[in-house]
From Swiss-Prot:
This is Ribosomal RNA small subunit methyltransferase H. Its main location: cytoplasm. Specifically methylates the N4 position of cytidine in position 1402 (C1402) of 16S rRNA. It comes from the Bacteria. The gene is rsmH. Its EC number is 2.1.1.199. InterPro entries: RsmH (IPR002903), SAM-dep_MeTrfase_MraW_recog (IPR023397), SAM-dependent_MTases_sf (IPR029063). S-adenosyl-L-methionine binds at residues 35-37, 55, 79, 101, 108. One of its GO terms (molecular function) is rRNA (cytosine-N4-)-methyltransferase activity.
Length: 313
């Protein structure tokens, strides 16, 4: 079924241009998806170039396996483990660029069977990799009311988190929730004030999805690993789709673009300062989609691309 879903790769040219591709370079596409970024990277690599792609979605892996190119390899797993994948291939400090396109993809949203969308009724799953971990339904059926409320507040910034959590728990006591339509209806009924521009279940679905897939922890671990695997001059090109993701990326790039923070007046020798090291990244700014791209693909509206370069420190 997956070939029936049209997929737009957001900020395609901009994200790949941000990598500053060298024909003989080694690159990582940490979120293969349907391969839009990977194919463009491959088109710019020479015979000696290499591209390592990663995805934890089995459907994405199936698409990746159709690419018959000796320069390309695919790994089925989370991008948070990119440090391990690189170490296994003896490529630590040799990666020339890492691209991450965060969040859920259009095919995942559009396929009702994946359970990501409140717009289509399907199994309440939401896992990026349906073969591993707890589904959204399983978690909601076993979680405490306070834990559900915390997730909705923390990852969905939902102001009615406590009311919605109570409604979910009460519904599950009477009849275990298994469908996306059920969750959407329970949330809508528990929301006292409706936003005319946004479905009342939007924040809840985002929060549960982020929790089920440990999305923010995945991002933080991948960013941390990037400092170890990138070569000097190597690039990070990262697309985020909501403020929680972008906040993590922005903070990481800002903190690592500074030198070591030493209290004013603290006596230190030149040798001691050298041991602290210099700044590890140089932030190269951010880009957002133009009006034409947003008109063609409304889901691109909230996307932000941030680019940084590894220093010699």
């Amino acid at each position: 079924m997956m070939e029936n879903y049209k997929h737009f790769t957001v900020l395609l040219d901009e994200a790949v241009n941000g990598l500053n591709i060298r024909p003989d370079g080694i690159y990582i596409d940490g979120t293969f998806g349907r391969g839009g970024h990977s194919r463009l990277i491959l088109s710019q690599l020479g015979e000696e170039g290499r591209l390592l792609a990663i995805d934890r979605d089995p459907q994405a892996i199936a698409v990746a396996k159709t690419i018959d190119d000796p320069r390309f390899s695919i790994i089925h797993g989370p991008f948070s483990a990119l440090g391990e994948y690189v170490a296994d291939r003896d490529l630590i400090g040799k990666i020339d660029g890492i691209l991450l396109d965060l969040g859920v993809s259009s095919p995942q949203l559009d396929d009702a069977e994946r359970g990501f969308s409140f717009m289509r009724d399907g199994p309440l799953d939401m896992r990026m990799d349906p073969t591993r971990g707890q589904s959204a339904a399983e978690w909601l059926q076993t979680a405490e009311e306070a834990d559900i409320a915390w997730v909705l507040k923390t990852y969905g910034e939902e102001r009615f988190a406590k009311r919605i959590a109570r409604a979910i728990v009460e519904h599950n006591r009477e009849q275990p929730m298994t469908r996306t339509k059920e969750l959407a209806e329970v949330v809508a009924a528990a929301t006292p004030v409706k936003d005319k521009f946004k479905h009342p279940a939007t924040r809840t679905f985002q929060a549960v999805r982020i929790w089920v897939n440990s999305e923010l922890e995945e991002i933080e671990q991948a960013l941390k690993s990037s400092l170890h695997v990138l070569a000097p001059g190597g690039r990070l090109s990262i697309i985020s789709f909501h403020s929680l993701e972008d906040r993590i990326v922005k903070r990481f790039m800002r903190e690592n673009s500074r030198g070591p923070q030493v209290p004013a007046g603290l006596p230190m020798t030149e040798e001691q300062l050298k041991k602290l090291g210099g700044r590890q990244l140089r932030a190269l700014g951010k880009l957002m989609p133009g009006e034409e791209e947003v008109a063609e693909n409304p889901r691109a509206r909230s996307s932000v691309l941030r680019i940084a370069e590894r220093t010699n420190a």
